[in-house]
Every structure is written in structure tokens, then in C-alpha cells.
From Swiss-Prot:
Protein name: Helix-loop-helix protein 26
Lineage, broadest ranks: Eukaryota, Metazoa, Ecdysozoa, Nematoda, Chromadorea
Predominant location: nucleus
Residue ranges of domain bHLH in the record: 14-65
GO molecular function, one term: protein dimerization activity
Compositionally biased residues, Basic and acidic residues: 18-33
Protein species of origin: Caenorhabditis elegans
Amino acid sequence: MSSSPTSSSSGSPSSHGHRSETEKQRRDDTNDLLNEFKKIVQKSESEKLSKEEVLFRIVKLLSGIQLHHESFSTSPGPIRSIKKIKSDREQVRRNKRVAAYRELRKFIALNNLSSSEEIDKMENLKVLEIIFEVIRGKSITCTVPCLPFPILPFLPVFPVYSPLVFNSYNQFSLYPPHMPTVQIPIVPSSSFEIDALEIEENEKDIDIVG
């Protein structure tokens, strides 16, 4: 008996449903991690931060690199439609995420936390998971010469280094209450160069984390 056109179609409802559930789980896991990162980098519990702002602060915390929001802004230009304005804003948010994940991938490569082949194919969620483990202190191994380095609150860190700052409560913090001394791997910034590869994850955009 010949199969019906419906049964021979390339995509069944069950496969689409499974893919949708997988994507939803990935979004939920990503948002959960971003909420954890937000607790680390926010200046107060009431501070509102977008996902992109959280990522930018994590990049600065790990590598000392300040990604500037202004560099991603679109020019006002002539009067545009509401649809065009929303499209431009979404593109700006996407560009910010690409830039932030690129720097996080560089950090992973510079600190030998994964192979270059794995990093090239790595999904953004996996990038966040690795960074979260680093912050929790489970993946910090000094395989290269280290130097004690004082970190002053509110002062930028030279981007050649990858500082891992813990305060007196053993919490990772942008603004430690005391000036700690940390072990900083001496890693040349030119050791690796990771291309900016945007991995489309059909991620539903949520402006405010938490």
C-alpha cells in the first residue's frame, strides 16, 4: 500500500514539536544563566539591565574590555516607520550580542578552556555555561605563569590580562569592597583570533533580565 502524501512529508508534527520544545528549553536555560550573571554585575538589586548590558559587563569583568553601546547605535536619519525603527533596534541588539559572545569566545580560547574547533561550533548557551563555571571557580587552572595583580574598584583592567576577581565573600563582583590580589594568567592578546560567528538560535528577545 502506498503511503499518503501526509505521511511521506519531510517534517512531521511531532518532529516540529520536539524542535520547538528544544528551542524553548535553550531559551529558558540562557535566560536563567543571564539572570545569574545579572546578580553578579548589577550595582544594586533594583538596577534594570538588558541582556546586552549584562553580557557587556561580564566581558569587562573577565577581560577588561569595555564594549561601548554608542558604537552600535543607528543614525536617526529621516522619519522612519515604526516597523523600520523596531527592525533597526533589533539589529542593534543582535550586533551587541554578537560582539559580546565574540569576546567571551576569545576569553575561552585565551585561557584554553576549550579547543579552537569546539569554540568555532559552540552555541551561545555553551559559551555562557563555560563562563559561569569559570566564575564559580571550578574551571580556573593556571597553566601559564601568573602574577599577583591588585584590582582597584571602578578602574578598568588592561585587556591583555584576564582578571578573575573575588571579594572577601568569595563572590565574583564588579565592585569588590576591598582591593584583592588575584592571580592573573599572562596571556598575550594576539595568541588567538576568533572570527565573529553569529549562531542563530531563534532566541526570543527579552529586553530586561529578571
